[in-house]
């Protein structure tokens, strides 16, 4: 791998990506969560954080949005540190499902075991493994982990949380199904609530890029200098992001971008260039798979301009 791009190179790539992404059309806000449908569709933000801790932004980089499924990639770090990679893989698995992120079919076809921690079934099972004697203690451990990644105190978007809690019957069904097969490790209603709360965290593109930069920096937050995940657990987490980070269009993303990434239906996207930097984008309109349209275009533009694709020699 070549050296970290200079801040001047990043600034140019960032400005070019922002200008390009503004012209990209298509996509619609997530409609199945009412509060997400109301987010202004014209918002666009891009942020880059290097392993040196430098932050560069374009657009509405401090506009908060719901982290949604991106949270899965960071709660995964806490649980992997807690119980170890081998035990986590035995309980949850590490393979793409080939199905939509909220599918129950993959559970039924594989004896009730969730296949990976970045789809809803596996992510809720991962939350069920977080330590704590009650809901408050479990949430305290979860939010402490997120705050360490973001180097700030994150808060729950109450409007999103209430909206999702009123419409998460499908996730409740998934949790009970996993429990019936013996692949759920705490009380389903409590865990679904904690999972919903986790997905409702407010985040900004700047904060999300810093969270990703912790992975780019081998598990150490490049701003606070705190270790937030064991170094040996970073590669398997990034591998999961390569396999399942953008739902059932992850293959298309990897074909075009060649970097581990994670998206959320709130319009966020984070990608990691190991040893160099992480980048995040926010734009609410989504493609049919649930990924930000402009965000993908923006980050792919930066990846091309800075030659960050992992598969380029």
Swiss-Prot record:
EC number per UniProt: 3.5.1.2
Binding site for substrate: 69, 120, 164, 171, 195, 247, 265
Subunit structure: Homotetramer.
Identification of the protein by name: Glutaminase
Stored Gene3D superfamilies: DD-peptidase/beta-lactamase superfamily
Reactions mediated catalytically: L-glutamine + H2O = L-glutamate + NH4(+)
Record carries keyword Transmembrane helix: no
Record family assignment: Belongs to the glutaminase family.
GO process terms (BP): glutamate biosynthetic process; glutamine catabolic process
Keyword terms: Hydrolase
GO molecular function: glutaminase activity
Transferase among keywords: no
Class of this enzyme: hydrolase
